[in-house]
Amino acid sequence: GDGTGCSSGFTPLMSLDITAHEIGHGVCEATCNLIYESEPGAINERFSDCWGATIENYANPMETDAVSKLIWYLGEEVDCGTPLRRMDFPKLSGDPDTYGGINWFPVISCVPTGGNDQCGVHTNSGVMNKWYYLITNGGSGTNDIGSVYSVTGLGFADAGNILYQTELIL
């Protein structure tokens, strides 16, 4: 955000979750240094989104818990009341929650440009954002390709540890 307020769509991008998200990019660069395009770029964005939620939860333990919707909204404080992304229900932000499912940005034969978000790095991060939500909170359902799932949530401490250990081995 450029600070001009809601008339431009964003207030300054200075919320806790956005700041943690940006620091998450630094962690990703220092650990696995994924190429910022296509599927690796979407994983990079997902790591950063997950750090945003994890740190926001850590900073506000008395105000929120793992099921609080605000923890799973990214940038709701800077996007004039609506989140930039929804980690709990990515489709509500126009992002996919299933690889190759509804809202998936096709990456095969995609040439990364600024105009296509480097082949959908922000859009396709929704798949792994949903994964992180599920391993943290748990949930069940049927995804876009017909696979049934039932996940027992681990909570933020264990989910965050899995997240970081994954970054270390990629």
Which residues fall in each region the model found?
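Active-site neighborhood of glycoside hydrolase catalytic domains
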Residues: I23
